[in-house]
Amino acid sequence: MNIRQQITQFLSLAYVFSSAFMLWKTLSVIANSHSPIVVVLSGSMEPAFQRGDILFLWNRDHQQKVGDIVVYEIDGKSIPIVHRVLREHHNSEKQLLLTKGDNNAVDDLSLYAKKQQYLNQKQDLVGTVKGYLPFIGYVTILISENVYFKYGMLGLLGLSSLFSNE
């Protein structure tokens, strides 16, 4: 393989990664969310959403209603949580939300940060669920939970880039 072919392969790979990054950033700006697409990681929202479903978020709603499904993050925890709004309180300055998973027996008070009784709509919410694709996100779960699958996928990607002729 000559140097020109190697440069072409590198540029093709760089093009794929930069296109994916640009698509992600475009979706982030349109949805007004740092994470416009999330994967359901647990069964707490069954039967509405199953583990492995991909959710599409929108964060341009000014007020959430009881029954809306929202994704939120808690300070100090890196994994976003998908749950339904159980109660809401608002005044002219902010909206406070209490959430609960459809498949959970109790509300999310124990999941919130210490001394936090409600979610702040502007600070804690990643977005409101507007659509989903069932089971497509299961690949992400397999990659994060199974080290052999992760290294196997990386190996296949590496081999395919080495042996491709384009």
From Swiss-Prot:
InterPro entries in alphabetical order: LexA/Signal_pep-like_sf, Pept_S26A_signal_pept_1_Ser-AS, Peptidase_S24_S26A/B/C, Peptidase_S26, Peptidase_S26B
Keyword Cell inner membrane: no
Enzyme Commission number: 3.4.21.89
First-level EC class: hydrolase
Topology Lumenal: residue spans: 31-166
SUPFAM superfamilies attached to this UniProt entry: LexA/Signal peptidase
Purpose of the protein: Catalytic component of the signal peptidase complex (SPC) which catalyzes the cleavage of N-terminal signal sequences from nascent proteins as they are translocated into the lumen of the endoplasmic reticulum. Specifically cleaves N-terminal signal peptides that contain a hydrophobic alpha-helix (h-region) shorter than 18-20 amino acids.
Domain topic, free-text comment: The C-terminal short (CTS) helix is essential for catalytic activity. It may be accommodated as a transmembrane helix in the thinned membrane environment of the complex, similarly to the signal peptide in the complex substrates.
Protein name: Signal peptidase complex catalytic subunit SEC11
Organism: Candida albicans (strain SC5314 / ATCC MYA-2876) (Yeast)
Gene name linked to the record: SEC11
